[in-house]
């Protein structure tokens, strides 16, 4: 019976260790928000005011959240100062809102960045959703879970930029695909 007790103790311990609140690495600049101009998004986007519900969510988020548009796309930009479960894939929210979500292959942009991509639909509305997380050193994640465990285990120190783009399935005629 003792080996079983020891095994369970080690399992509980293994789960608890990565969930401790302080990551191994710490970046002292993590609390200094650099402003939206530093975000890895195109310049000249128009800010969109958050809804009341979005503002309530942002109040408990460990960082800053901004929403912007270029007229054809919506950019949800999150500056994240610490690992958190409050950063989750767009598909989680979209599924909760009744959208169907179909994962697509990783999108490689002309600038060399990589994006997790999905096709989503709700009734007749269809969108392509792209998302990525990038740290100040240029390391990127296309999967929120991979980012979380990397951050929670202290493999990198924040802050990070998380960018989600909601766009038509095909860019409108005459509109260049961003990033």
Q: Language model features by range: what are they?
A:
Residues 2-20:
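Hydrophobic membrane-insertion alpha-helices, especially the h-region
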Residues 159-179:
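Surface-exposed amphipathic alpha-helical segments
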Residues 11, 43, 163:
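A residue-level signal for conserved active-site and pocket-lining positions in enzyme catalytic cores
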Residues 34-153:
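Short, solvent-exposed recognition patches
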Residues 16, 24-27, 64-71:
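Terminal, regulation- and interaction-focused segments at domain boundaries
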Residues 21-41:
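Alpha-helical transmembrane signal-anchor/signal-peptide segments
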């Amino acid at each position: 019976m003792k080996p079983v007790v020891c095994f369970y103790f080690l399992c509980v311990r293994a789960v608890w260790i990565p969930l401790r609140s302080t990551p191994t690495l710490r970046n002292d600049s993590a609390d200094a928000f650099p402003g939206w101009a530093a975000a890895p998004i195109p310049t000249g986007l128009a800010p969109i005011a958050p809804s009341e519900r979005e503002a309530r969510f942002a109040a408990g988020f460990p960082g800053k959240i901004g929403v912007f548009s270029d007229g054809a796309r919506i950019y949800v930009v999150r500056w994240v100062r610490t690992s958190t479960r409050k950063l989750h894939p767009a598909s989680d929210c979209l599924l909760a809102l009744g959208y169907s979500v179909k994962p697509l292959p990783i999108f490689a942009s002309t600038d060399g960045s990589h994006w997790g991509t999905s096709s989503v639909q709700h009734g007749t509305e269809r969108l392509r959703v792209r998302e990525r997380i990038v740290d100040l050193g240029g390391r990127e994640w296309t999967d929120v879970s991979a980012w979380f465990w990397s951050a929670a285990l202290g493999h990198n120190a924040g802050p990070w930029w998380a960018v989600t783009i909601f766009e038509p399935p095909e860019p409108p005629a005459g509109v260049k695909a961003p990033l």
